[in-house]
């Protein structure tokens, strides 16, 4: 599917020395239904998607992939704590055309950074079980560079073609 859970499952399989079979689903809903119903023995998906079913006792999250425990699930260990040296995080960012003038990028970046620091924004993100992170365009570019370096070998090894 080309998603973070897809490539994370491949990376996890390699680190754990298991042959992870990635099965594409048309969204998290059908995946969760099959996981709860026992048609799928294990799955990888985003924490915000799986947490309500975990809290309802319908499935069990074994580990999270962040560098530290999630503030939304402090009872769930990280993969690293569980003995598998894996760290991967998802993120969202605002992008603009490469041709956008630098002064506009700077203004837009400053406005977005300000909004991301507002308490109302932090509450909205928290309610969606996400953490609001304010960053500058330069910080985002650096994060993207590191992200590409982390995932390029996994994507290449998988043979994935968009």
For each of these PLM feature ranges, what is it?
Residues 1-162:
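Conserved, function-defining micro-sites of small-solute handling proteins
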